[in-house]
Amino acid sequence: MTFPVEKVRADFPILQREVNGLPLAYLDSAASAQKPNQVIDAESAFYRHGYAAVHRGIHTLSAQATESMENVRKQASRFINARSAEELVFVRGTTEGINLVANSWGAENIRAGDNIIISEMEHHANIVPWQMLCERKGAELRVIPLHPDGTLRLETLAALFDDRTRLLAITHVSNVLGTENPLPDMIALARQHGAKVLVDGAQAVMHHAVDVQALDCDFYVFSGHKLYGPTGIGILYVKEALLQEMPPWEGGGSMISTVSLTQGTTWAKAPWRFEAGTPNTGGIIGLGAAIDYVTSLGLDKIGDYEQMLMRYALEQLAQVPDITLYGPAQRLGVIAFNLGKHHAYDVGSFLDNYGIAVRTGHHCAMPLMAWYGVPAMCRASLAMYNTHEEVDRLVAGLTRIHRLLG
């Protein structure tokens, strides 16, 4: 059975619009995916008919909103096959989830002389929090280097570990190169040294199923807005035993058990002690609708379609004169490229004139840009609603730009 891409496209109202008098070809889903009617309608219905502050409310609307929120926690736990819904913390997104781990688990467990391992392909969200932590603690940040094809030099990884390695923080899929890292092998090596493992799953969960129990990672984090859900909501998974030991990193309402001016404060149990203040309940409802949506289509079918489209795109783009493609042949979601010596911003601006939306810049991966010796790249993302025709338009646009700019 073929993937129903036209039916899927009909669910996304923004795909019906034009840009500069041409049909929109949205090739920027790795930055933020568009939203289907099912997500828009679910969040709208909540605000129209079901909104109330969650927790402790005795009235019907509050009780129903709280139940809806906790049902999404259960739904998200099934989505990544967590052992328990109480292993999931609602966060604003991947960035906040990583910072939570750094400022809670990291603050308690990293000591002077310890080390944390990351890779050269990481998003800044999985670099900067660890830099800040290491600077505060007197710890060392170690880096897995790259091969020219955009895969990690895994032969160097074993030498980076020692008895002071406390954490491996690694992206599941590179947001620039599309490289899917071999997590089982990397996690097994971390286990040999007693290190914990955090996985940045922001670019993975929309492309194929994720099973955190099978991975045996300690932390897994992703954002809703890249999964066709709302902005301002994400999921941090933490193994229950670890989560129960972690102290809160933000104080306020909802995360306490008792507060006394003379006796101090006691915390709520996890995960609620990590959810200070009024949550983004509407975003949580929208995230649940997004999970429902991709689950109903089947992540295996989505993945098969996207891989077929990726193969086609790589074949066609390789024929564009003076193009440089970055990353491995086998990849997920993104194609980074440059056209001759032209700056990525110029290429992206021309493509926008043709109604084609791509991302340009350093993609929050400046160390990776430095490794390739370029200030910026163009990046085209392929999502489940993209088509062969849109790939053809991208190729034609780049060919025309090459002809115009020389």
Curated annotation (Swiss-Prot):
Keywords: Cytoplasm, Lyase, Pyridoxal phosphate, Transferase
Gene3D superfamilies: Aspartate Aminotransferase, domain 1, Type I PLP-dependent aspartate aminotransferase-like (Major domain)
GO cellular component annotations of the record: cytoplasm
Subcellular localization, as worded in the UniProt entry: Cytoplasm
Pfam families: Aminotran_5 (PF00266)
Signal peptide segment: none
Required cofactor(s): pyridoxal 5'-phosphate
Residues the record lists as N6-(pyridoxal phosphate)lysine modifications: K226
Catalytic activity: (sulfur carrier)-H + L-cysteine = (sulfur carrier)-SH + L-alanine; L-selenocysteine + AH2 = hydrogenselenide + L-alanine + A + H(+)
PANTHER family: CYSTEINE DESULFURASE (PTHR43586:SF25)
Annotated family: Belongs to the class-V pyridoxal-phosphate-dependent aminotransferase family. Csd subfamily.
Function: Cysteine desulfurases mobilize the sulfur from L-cysteine to yield L-alanine, an essential step in sulfur metabolism for biosynthesis of a variety of sulfur-containing biomolecules. Component of the suf operon, which is activated and required under specific conditions such as oxidative stress and iron limitation. Acts as a potent selenocysteine lyase in vitro, that mobilizes selenium from L-selenocysteine. Selenocysteine lyase activity is however unsure in vivo.
Protein name: Cysteine desulfurase
Organism classification: Bacteria, Pseudomonadati, Pseudomonadota, Gammaproteobacteria, Enterobacterales
